[in-house]
Amino acid sequence: MRKFIFVLLTLLLVSPFSFAMKGIIWQPQNRDSQVTDTQWQGLMSQLRLQGFDTLVLQWTRYGDAFTQPEQHALLFKRAAAAQQAGLKLIVGLNADPEFFMHQKQSSAALESYLNRLLAADLQQARLWSAVPGVTPDGWYISAEIDDLNWRSEAARQPLLTWLNNAQRLISDVSAKPVYISSFFAGNM
């Protein structure tokens, strides 16, 4: 457990952006396409005026959502508008709606699953690195790490390998900070 905490803290502290940001998280939904460009630009300007400096897209793919070219185009346009309003942009990568279910697998199956997640994250990072007019200021791994499911050494080892590989390989796509969130429910 100590090694796990050490790796998480190290990942946070090695980033030049490890100081607190005044960010807001956006969980893109298909229904967001109903918001007009003018409304979105106004919202981004208001966020900046209210002191926010960063927009974190929690994901740019969620299961089968945001896989179509027109859905990509909408997210690209929203991201560009945020940056035009003066916000930094942290781009969330792939989110698997079944992430928490897969944590219950055997170590070998878990390792295979985490490798598939990494491949999907890398695909998203490459896609977003090539978008004209959008320059991500960082990457967000959409998986959430809790203090219950990773307690055993058998579960923690694939997780630590995955986190180290994710940070290294995503940074190879674009040398920007890589973020991940964790939550604690008193299970330490």
Predicted regions: what is each one?
Residues 22-26, 55-57, 89-93, 137, ...:
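Hydrophobic faces of well-ordered beta-strands that scaffold small-molecule active sites
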